[in-house]
Amino acid sequence: MYTIMLKAKLHMARVTHAVLDYEGSCAIDGELLDLAGIRENEQIQIYDVENGNRFTTYAIRGEAGSRLISINGAAAHQAQVGDRVIICSYAHYAEHELATHQPALVYLQDGNQISHTSHAIPVQFA
């Protein structure tokens, strides 16, 4: 049996472009893709913190170092420039992989600069 687990997350990215007439997808700065371990053409989920929209698309490589987050095609209706988004990818893991699985978490700050990275989400307290 396989379990779907969080593989990677870009937390609080800022949308820099929303291009309706582009072929589709989400262009992400290549450095951020590599750091998170998200592959080009990999399915991603995007959660817009500003409006609550959640949608699925795929990642394409943006210019390295540009800090680009471009929501393209029909998905451009779901997010606006300046919106904070959480970009996640998930993968299927076999039972024997679960004990050692650690997601790649990349936390971003203003200008989509890297704040820090982690492999565990902090425990939430009541």
UniProtKB/Swiss-Prot annotation:
Residues holding substrate: 57, 73-75
Active site: 25 (schiff-base intermediate with substrate), 58 (proton donor)
Keywords of the record: Autocatalytic cleavage, Cytoplasm, Decarboxylase, Lyase, Pantothenate biosynthesis, Pyruvate, Schiff base, Zymogen
One annotated GO molecular function: aspartate 1-decarboxylase activity
Modified residues (Pyruvic acid (Ser)): 25
SUPFAM superfamilies, alphabetized: ADC-like (SSF50692)
Post-translational modification: Is synthesized initially as an inactive proenzyme, which is activated by self-cleavage at a specific serine bond to produce a beta-subunit with a hydroxyl group at its C-terminus and an alpha-subunit with a pyruvoyl group at its N-terminus.
GO CC terms in record: cytosol
Cofactor detail note: Binds 1 pyruvoyl group covalently per subunit.
Subcellular location: Cytoplasm
Family that this chain belongs to: Belongs to the PanD family.
Entries under PANTHER family matching the protein: ASPARTATE 1-DECARBOXYLASE
HAMAP family: PanD
Name of this protein: Aspartate 1-decarboxylase
Organism: Chromohalobacter salexigens (strain ATCC BAA-138 / DSM 3043 / CIP 106854 / NCIMB 13768 / 1H11)
